[in-house]
Amino acid sequence: GWASKIGTQLGKMAKVGLKEFVQS
């Protein structure tokens, strides 16, 4: 459903943000 889609998008954004945060 749409809730799982949003959850997946948030998960991807969180992973990308975490990578950028660790690298900086």
Curated annotation (Swiss-Prot):
Q: Which organism is it from?
A: Xenopus borealis
Q: What is its main location?
A: secreted
Give the UniProt entry's GO cellular component terms: extracellular region
Family per similarity comment? Belongs to the gastrin/cholecystokinin family. Magainin subfamily.
Q: Which GO biological-process labels does this protein carry?
A: defense response to bacterium
Location within or outside the cell: Secreted
- Name of protein: Xenoposin precursor fragment B2
Q: In which tissues is it expressed?
A: Expressed by the skin glands.
So what does this one do? Has antimicrobial activity against Gram-negative bacterium E.coli ATCC 25922 (MIC=100 uM), Gram-positive bacterium S.auerus ATCC 25923 (MIC=25 uM).
Keywords linked to the UniProt accession: Antibiotic, Antimicrobial, Secreted
